[in-house]
Amino acid sequence: MEKSEKELTPMLSQYHYFKNQYPDCLLLFRLGDFYELFYEDAYIGSKELGLVLTSRPAGKGKERIPMCGVPYHSANSYIAKLVNKGYKVAICEQVEDPSKAKGIVKREVVRVITPGTFFERDTGGLASLYKKGNHYYVGYLNLAVGEFLGAKVKIEELLDLLSKLNIKEILVKKGEKLPEELEKVLKVYVSELEEEFFEEGSEEILKDFGVLSLQAFGFEEDTYSLPLGAVYKYAKTTQKGYTPLIPRPKPYRDEGFVRLDIKAIKGLEILESLEGRKDISLFKVIDRTLTGMGRRRLKFRLLSPFRSREKIERIQEGVQELKENREALLKIRQILEGMADLERLVSKISSNMATPRELVYLKNSLKKVEELRLLLLELKAPIFKEILQNFEDTKKIINDIEKTLVEDPPLHVKEGGLIREGVNAYLDELRFIRDNAETYLREYEKKLRQETGIQSLKIGYNKVMGYYIEVTKPNLKYVPSYFRRRQTLSNSERFTTEELQRLEEKILSAQTRINDLEYELYKELRERVVKELDKVGNNASAVAEVDFIQSLAQIAYEKDWAKPQIHEGYELIIEEGRHPVIEEFVENYVPNDTKLDRDSFIHVITGPNMAGKSSYIRQVGVLTLLSHIGSFIPARRAKIPVVDALFTRIGSGDVLALGVSTFMNEMLEVSNILNNATEKSLVILDEVGRGTSTYDGIAISKAIVKYISEKLKAKTLLATHFLEITELEGKIEGVKNYHMEVEKTPEGIRFLYILKEGKAEGSFGIEVAKLAGLPEEVVEEARKILRELEEKENKKEDIVPLLEETFKKSEEAQRLEEYEEIIKKIEEIDIGNTTPLQALLILAELKKKCSFSKKESGA
């Protein structure tokens, strides 16, 4: 039971005052060299951080309260763990020197750290959502790298946008229901705010940026100010005096990028594998960047590839020049190596959180930036000329830091020893006093002996009196009038002078004064640097682009990748293409060719499981994606058309967490593709229809192929285990059959991973099962059943016509007609104009027909 305020110690009363202001936060309460957690917060801290739980008296009586703590100098690592687990953390700091405090030390909550605002340890961002009609207006703020964007998307596009922006926290109006998949798929922290917060934020952002409307920044509607204002106000409210420099907001533009939704990002394993492993992702395998900003630029380009041939080719020219000019590439990499993350430094410096060492890192990195600029002057590719125009002169910052700070300053600003000699005359004097106190005293003693003629005069010190002048009794008659008596002893008297008192004060307080003065000089330096940070930000962006290009050049050189020809036409040709990720981990990778053109733009790929169907179709998608960021690709030669979108249907992914069946998810994903793909899109479909019965799967797959052929003309790769789909070649425009070659051996089968024209001869499922290690008796039983089925199947040349003739007058024939009626109905569905709800109703009707047929037959 909590004590009343009167019974608590003054410190705990102060704690309760702040805890009541921030009840939804863990309150880190500064006590000396530790941040302490009390009460329930202590239990949470002990559990989540593995801290030892202790206790202290609550006040009068014997009651004790639980507590645990972390050292203040290493608090960030503990805070990171708490924030990553979804907690908000309020920092209650001592705001006065405890040695000078009268009574309880003054404290204030100086900052609230949330998942979207912990910019020291993460580059994740903060998003605010404002729903209006069928659209969401999105405000996005990344404090770590100074990115402030506004977007407007349809409800169904929201997940794709937020997944690209790397959101850690979402702000919504209290009581507003979010799309269910946002929290579950993105796994983000949601903070609910009163509607007034959005309105106040809207007013605040306009006022602070000095505009009447955000249309001044390119936003077409005033509604953008609500979500943008909310993230802006939230950042300032939580970060208080530590708020980094927030740039003016920019509209998020996606018109110039290839459409890449969250399904394609997952399906092509761009950032992580289907199993969730980041170490075998496309990004990880091709990343040769050397700076934090370059790494983020590469990731951004992979998620937002260019849709402009001109932009792609400009990047390609830069990559080619560096690939061929090995000396220049090595010099660039040497310059970039060890360069600080300038974007992150801008945020830390502007938030008053940068250490002296980080300012030195900034200075050294800006020197490297100048080296890089001079090197780029020697290169010929137009892209480097463009980048050069973005560099800004930062010599003023470099010189200022160099003249002010020592080369290897301490980690913490208040430790002293960070300002160079000659910067401040008084500081130099204090240091001399500190380092030469004894010399100062002996010189003053000598001076006094000369002035008074008292040769036995001496200066001494004790803790009670401090410094004093001692004169023996025989010499008291020579003591000058400016000597002030302090103490009388039996054989001598002790005096002081104004000059000795000044000297004493200087000596005893020199180190404290040194530290305080150095801190003030450091703050002045930091303020001067802050005024120049826009230049640093522009240079950071230029460096990021160079790092991105050199990374592509480095891997192209390492792997001997080829430059794809980019064109505005239709055909997609890849000769001896290889999957860059699989090739990294598999020896003797087998390359394959691809040719999608007007005559064959739907490739149906068959073959047994493990033969390489899925890897091949993803390979084509990955190589197309790489081509659109300006990268060279693992192929002998390639001709890649500019595409407007990359669609994939691969695996069921995270939707299982939403309670959606595999089959329903397949249909929703395919529906999205059929409703949005165009002739300029590339579509990757892997095993569509596997989540339902064989007949359903075949019927739906055929209907999809027909729709793509007749309505979309999109270049499509369809991997399937339904051999019946191969019947469409020659019947439907654009369909061409391919299969993954398999070699039969006495021991079973051997996968060759070679793509060949024509359909697969059988599925080899039992052989694959044997390779997987199924018990021999299971394999033999499966072979026996398969032979029986094949004997029945061999009696039919074409399943549908022969069944019609054989069972025309039988009950089985009637059932076949009913199934054909169902198939016909499926083929007649206009998927492009069918909503998910309509699809469910149609499925329900078809299921009812199937159930009726079974009852009629007595099945």
Curated annotation (Swiss-Prot):
Gene3D superfamilies in the cross-refs: 1.10.1420.10, DNA repair protein MutS, domain I, MutS, connector domain, P-loop containing nucleotide triphosphate hydrolases
UniProt entry tagged with the keyword Metal-binding: no
GO molecular-function term, one example from the UniProt record: ATP binding
Annotated keywords: ATP-binding, DNA damage, DNA repair, DNA-binding, Nucleotide-binding
PROSITE patterns: DNA_MISMATCH_REPAIR_2
Pfam families hit by this protein: MutS_I, MutS_II, MutS_III, MutS_IV, MutS_V
Gene Ontology BP terms: mismatch repair
InterPro entries in the record: DNA_mismatch_repair_MutS, DNA_mismatch_repair_MutS-lik_N, DNA_mismatch_repair_MutS/MSH, DNA_mismatch_repair_MutS_C, DNA_mismatch_repair_MutS_clamp, DNA_mismatch_repair_MutS_core, DNA_mismatch_repair_MutS_N, DNA_mismatch_repair_MutS_sf
Binding site for ATP: G607, P608, N609, M610, A611, G612, K613, S614
Coiled coil residues, start to end: none
A single Gene Ontology CC term: cytosol
Keyword ATP-binding in annotation: yes
Function summary: This protein is involved in the repair of mismatches in DNA. It is possible that it carries out the mismatch recognition step. This protein has a weak ATPase activity.
Record-linked HAMAP family: MutS
UniProt record similarity statement: Belongs to the DNA mismatch repair MutS family.
UniProt name for this protein: DNA mismatch repair protein MutS
